[in-house]
Amino acid sequence: MAAPAQVVTALAPQGVLRAVVNLGNPVLAQGTPEAPSGVTVDLAREVGRRLGVPVVLECVDAARLSFAAVAEGRADVGFLAVEPERAAQVAFTEPYVLIEGVFAVPEGSWVRTADDVDRPGVRVGVKQGSAYDLFLTRTLQHAEVVRGADGTVAFEEHALEVAAGIRQPLTRYVATRPGLRVVEPRFTEIRQAVATGRDRDPAAVAWLRDVVAGLTADGFVAASLERSGQDATVPG
């Protein structure tokens, strides 16, 4: 069924769907700016197909850049973790995938569980503006958040006690560096959703939510993740 004209106008006011894709999250997007792939690319193209408009992809390398593009109206949709700070400026669908934030530490560290991290004198490396940066900034009371181009970059450059990151890439990082280990359990569950500007027509936001919920429920998201070789949890 074609989307109502009101929805098309609200979500694609320039006659194309401008979608911002974060290549910095390898679970959700892969490839190059010239040839991106992954579940977020598939979702963008499917939303565009249902709207009946072409899709223009803008690729960035950090969630904060995706957020800025959507919040400032330079992109019509983006793919972001649901966070209270972001929800003040963008409208979210329900999550289409769940990923985990985990810590990594040296093998000899006294940190045994995620709860051990929040102590005075502990410094945690994070990717600036990432979902887990926002979460840890909001929740840590004693440990210090140190931001960098990536949590592992900050961890190495500043000889930090802890690195934070998304489970899949952080696990791969640890696997190539003897002397490090991943801390279990996760410290947060990251709820990835589709975002659009909070000023968009409520009917269009509701339509987008329905579409994403349907694509999550009918196996579209799971199939896309499988094609891209990603192991992530689909809600429901």
Spell out what each predicted region is:
Residues 1-10, 131-148, 213-236:
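Ligand-binding clefts/hinges and TM-proximal coupling segments of bilobed small-molecule sensing domains
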Residues 94-96, 105-123, 206:
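Flexible hinge/capping segments at coil-to-helix
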Residues 16-23, 27, 37, 115-132, ...:
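Short loop->beta-strand "edge-of-pocket" segments that line small-molecule binding or catalytic clefts
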Residues 29-33, 44-54, 93-94, 118, ...:
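Ligand-binding cleft/hinge of the Venus flytrap
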Residues 23, 97-107, 171-213, 229-236:
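Periplasmic-binding protein-like
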Residues 64, 68, 80-89, 135-138, ...:
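A ligand-binding cleft/hinge motif common to bilobed small-molecule-binding domains
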Residues 56-68, 111-112, 144-157:
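Short helix-initiation/N-cap motifs at beta->coil->alpha
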Residues 2-81, 86-88, 218:
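Extracytoplasmic small-molecule ligand-binding "clamshell" domains
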